[in-house]
Amino acid sequence: MPRVKRSVTARARHKKVLKLAKGYRGRRKNIYRIAKQAVMKAGQYAYRDRRQRKRQFRALWIARINAAVRELGMTYSTFMNGLKKSGIGLDRKVLADLAVFDKAAFEKITNQVKTSLAN
């Protein structure tokens, strides 16, 4: 059986990992063994944080809606309850956007919610 030399594939694999580690500090950017570990850990963080990003944005939207609704004399939970009862089908992302950039429209929605809760 012929001898297999792996220089071409090994070099390609090393180049690929070191390219991914570009911009890292210290030996993490130019020592293959350390760079490989750093790239693996970066991938784990990326995987985890893609899921956490969704939670963090939802929390941000809720905080913005809560702040805007409290200025108008309601709490977040009563506002969301009234929103469901009044049949307004806006999600938290759109509501938070309205609360920040279009206060007049958000105030109209809040008034609709208040009237639906009063009935």
Swiss-Prot record:
Gene Ontology molecular function terms on file: rRNA binding; structural constituent of ribosome
GO terms (BP aspect): ribosomal large subunit assembly; translation
Record keywords, A-Z: Ribonucleoprotein, Ribosomal protein, RNA-binding, rRNA-binding
One Gene Ontology CC term in the entry: ribosome
Cross-referenced InterPro entries: Ribosomal_bL20, RIBOSOMAL_L20_CS, Ribosomal_protein_bL20_C
Pfam families the UniProt entry points to: Ribosomal_L20
Biological function: Binds directly to 23S ribosomal RNA and is necessary for the in vitro assembly process of the 50S ribosomal subunit. It is not involved in the protein synthesizing functions of that subunit.
HAMAP family per UniProt: Ribosomal_bL20
Family: Belongs to the bacterial ribosomal protein bL20 family.
Protein's name according to its UniProt entry: Large ribosomal subunit protein bL20
Species assigned in the record: Nitrosomonas eutropha (strain DSM 101675 / C91 / Nm57)
